[in-house]
Amino acid sequence: MVKHIILWTLRPELSEEEKQTVKAGIKQGLEGLVGKVPGLIEVKVNISGRLASSNADVMLDSTLESPEALKAYSQHPDHVAVANSKVRPYTVSRTCLDFEI
């Protein structure tokens, strides 16, 4: 199995209300991919509880069946649609950590 962890920082020009709306959209979009993308076992998107010591706004914690499933996930049309509509327009940085478990 593979863990796919992403941290995003939202655009600073977004108001707090806009940030909450964007975070909810990211959570709904990514968590909604379970059952649609083969090999995607679990998705958790953390959008709350951020402490002042944090330097990211949103965290994706996902589990996939294999490295091959991760590659297929990254190219899956439903994932690409969520990334292009709910994530990329509103973020300024992305940090990724993929590892086998």
Task: State where each predicted segment sits.
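C-terminal structural segments of small proteins and small subunits
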Residues: P67-T95
